[in-house]
């Protein structure tokens, strides 16, 4: 999500991509498809959805907010039609997946290692490649980036594919940790937690600012908040109120710190 926001976009379908792609893949594994085949099925589904989202935003020029919101509902409906269960379990005896979610290397849990490796890879991509610099240019001033010769439409498609790949990787770790995929998460607050991670981490909603370190900070803050909810036994209704207030406050603060001038706002809309 952070990458999309840096580019002045948004993707509300990320959680649905994770749950939908892996629910279908787990059903196929239960039907006899090898583990590697199931992993590739989930990967293919995620990539296709990312391409469709990107094409709708870049070439059809539909608003990203509504495209990805609609995509989330479509993914949920199709996945639940194909795998009509709130919880789809992974086949038994899959040590590689189990190790990925519950294993340790030198005492460090594998999910943390996967997260750090993905964060480093994304940091290098954004900071050391021309494509990464183009993404920042797009978020800072789309019209100037276009006049500089940057092909924004293919770049936007690539951004949504990358987000889908991150969702696929998150699902892989999720299954390794829990041994299942829960379609119910598409109807919960996880998508708002993802947005909170981005906003609280300091990635500007007007685009062009922030980075991987911002996402790491946001993850730490949200992790602390969720742990506090658990320790204090805060009920779900109050949790949602707090989430909403924190998100609104963070958006107002971001808008105050990074105001969009009239010309830039017009170019990005």
Regions of interest found by a model, annotated:
Residues 1-2, 43, 72-79, 114-124, ...:
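Hydrophobic core segments of alpha-helical transmembrane domains in multi-pass membrane transport
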Residues 32-72, 217-218:
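Alpha-helical transmembrane segments within multi-pass membrane transporters and channels
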Residues 34-42, 47-53, 104-182:
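Helix-loop-helix "hairpin" substructures at the membrane interface of multi-pass membrane proteins
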Residues 3, 27, 31, 51-59, ...:
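Membrane-interface helix caps of multi-pass small-molecule transporters
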Residues 167, 178, 182-244:
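Transmembrane alpha-helical segments in multi-pass inner-membrane proteins
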Residues 64-128, 155-158, 177-187, 238, ...:
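Transmembrane helix-bundle core of multi-pass membrane transporters
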Residues 1-31, 55-61, 195-213, 245:
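Single transmembrane alpha-helix segments in multi-pass membrane proteins
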Residues 120-121, 140, 147-154, 225, ...:
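Cytosolic-side transmembrane-helix boundaries in multi-pass membrane proteins
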């Amino acid at each position: 999500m952070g990458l999309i926001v840096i580019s002045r976009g948004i993707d509300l379908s990320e959680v649905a991509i994770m749950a939908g792609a892996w629910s279908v893949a787990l059903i196929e594994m239960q039907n006899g498809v090898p583990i590697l085949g199931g992993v590739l099925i989930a990967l293919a589904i995620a990539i296709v959805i990312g391409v469709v989202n990107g094409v709708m935003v870049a070439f059809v020029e539909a608003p990203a907010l509504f495209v990805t919101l609609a995509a989330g509902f479509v993914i949920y409906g199709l996945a639940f039609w194909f795998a009509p269960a709130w919880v789809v379990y992974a086949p038994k005896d899959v040590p590689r997946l189990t190790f990925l979610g519950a294993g340790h290397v030198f005492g460090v849990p594998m999910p943390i290692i996967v997260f750090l490796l993905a964060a480093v890879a994304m940091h290098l991509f954004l900071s050391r490649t021309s494509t990464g610099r183009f993404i920042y240019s797009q978020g800072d001033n789309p019209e100037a980036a276009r006049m500089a010769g940057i092909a924004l439409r293919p770049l936007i498609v690539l951004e949504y594919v990358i987000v889908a790949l991150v969702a696929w990787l998150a699902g892989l770790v999720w299954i390794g940790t829990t041994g299942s995929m829960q379609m119910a998460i598409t109807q919960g607050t996880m998508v708002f937690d993802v947005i909170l991670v981005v906003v609280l981490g300091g990635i500007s909603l007007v685009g062009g600012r922030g980075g991987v370190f911002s996402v790491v900070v946001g993850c730490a803050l949200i992790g602390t908040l969720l742990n506090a909810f658990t320790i204090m036994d805060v009920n779900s209704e109050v949790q949602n109120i707090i989430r909403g207030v924190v998100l609104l406050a963070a958006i107002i603060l971001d808008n105050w710190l990074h105001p969009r001038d009239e010309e830039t706002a017009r170019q990005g809309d």
